[in-house]
Amino acid sequence: MAGHSKWATTKHKKAVIDARRGKLFAKLIKNIEVAARTGGGDPDGNPTLYDAIQKAKKNSVPLDNIERARKRGAGEEAGGADWETIMYEGYAPGGVALLVECLTDNRNRAASEVRVAVTRNGGSMADAGSVSYLFNRKGLVVVPKEGTTEDDVTLAVLDAGAEDVNDVGEAFEVICEPSDLVAVRTALQEAGIEYESAELSFIPSVEVPLDEEGARKVMRLVDALEDSDDVQNVYTNADIPDEIMAKIS
């Protein structure tokens, strides 16, 4: 189980994380609130909530903020918005497929902000279903390389349902079916292997290779989308080589 996945914008996000820490905190808090509302406020009985809390902790969200979000979602504390998940589809420059996942309390505002960000940066919106078929819904666990090897990770997750382990530079990505995400994450924990995040994602079935100019255009559009408070995640099928990503980050 090897290979090299460049579809994610994870490394790019890390490069701009300091400038956007406030926005990142807000999005992580929103994830906790929605997970608690959907599956209950007990992380032990709600794997999605557990993973949302762990991700927030690893991104240094204050524990008090995390607990308040959990309580709001579970109905133990007043407040909290009526969040709605909406997926928008489109194309970035160069024919790169684009999935934009929003979590919003105002559908009209979200649609407007996504449309403006896409069209002002050389992209175009697409009808529902015309882009999403290029992606598969998968579980994704990111494991930092420090202190572990690809063989260590592979051995730990092989019997837990993992489909692939990819070396993506500073980390390994473990890909699995959504139903196997908890088993894969648990297998890593039992093997004593630290992981950075465990969540559902969209993995492209076909990638579009980009040169530096094309990569800059696509990442400019992604940045514009991620500036919106309503946008939770942006998925593309761009294939950007490491050396180009390092230049433009």
Curated annotation (Swiss-Prot):
It is found in: Cytoplasm. Its main location: cytoplasm. GO terms for molecular function: DNA binding. The keyword Electron transport does not apply. SUPFAM superfamilies: YebC-like. Gene3D superfamilies: 1.10.10.200, 3.30.70.980. One of its GO terms (cellular component) is cytosol. The keyword Membrane does not apply. One of its GO terms (biological process) is regulation of DNA-templated transcription. It comes from the Bacteria. Keywords: Cytoplasm, DNA-binding, Transcription, Transcription regulation. InterPro entries: Integrase-like_N, TACO1_YebC-like_2nd/3rd_dom, TACO1_YebC_N, Transcrip_reg_TACO1-like, Transcrip_reg_TACO1-like_dom3, YebC-like. Belongs to the TACO1 family. This is Probable transcriptional regulatory protein Tfu_2096.
